[in-house]
Every structure is written in C-alpha cells, then in structure tokens.
Amino acid sequence: MTVIRLTRIGRKKKPFYRVVVTDSRKRRDGGWIESIGYYNPLSEPKDIKIDKERLDYWKGVGAKMSERVEKLSQKA
C-alpha cells in the first residue's frame, strides 16, 4: 500500500522532515517514490510546505496519509 508520511532528515537534536510518498513496507528513512514537501518544527513559526496538487493526485490514486501529515496538510 502507498502511504504519505514524514521521513526525518537533519542532524541530531535538530529535526527536519520531508513529506514523502512511499510504500508502507519501507522503513521510515528508506527509499521513497516522490517528495512532495517539507516540515521544519524548529523554526518560528513552524515552516510547512506541501505541494497540494501532488497531494491530491496521490490521494486520488489511493495513497493513505499518516495522522501527522493529515494535521500538517490542514495547516499548510
């Protein structure tokens, strides 16, 4: 199954996340199909960018979003 979730990039104690489309069987930081945005929780205000067109496309194809990505997409 295809899922839309966060993958962590960034250094120790300085998280930065990429919003990616991946297979649900892959590890959190494993390979991904497409990167559709990013999330920086350390900046003030929190920096969120998600490509709405690509998000809608992947949801239309049947990809499921993680809970965190659903919350972030409402804020973006």
Swiss-Prot record:
Gene Ontology biological-process annotations: translation
Entries under Pfam families matching the protein: Ribosomal_S16 (PF00886)
PROSITE patterns documented for this protein: RIBOSOMAL_S16 (PS00732)
GO cellular component terms, A-Z: cytoplasm; small ribosomal subunit
Signal peptide as annotated in the record: none
Gene Ontology molecular function: any one: structural constituent of ribosome
SUPFAM superfamilies reported for this sequence: Ribosomal protein S16
Keyword terms, alphabetized: Ribonucleoprotein, Ribosomal protein
Coiled-coil spans in chain: none
Family the UniProt entry places it in: Belongs to the bacterial ribosomal protein bS16 family.
Protein name: Small ribosomal subunit protein bS16
Organism: Helicobacter acinonychis (strain Sheeba)
Species classification: Bacteria, Pseudomonadati, Campylobacterota, Epsilonproteobacteria, Campylobacterales
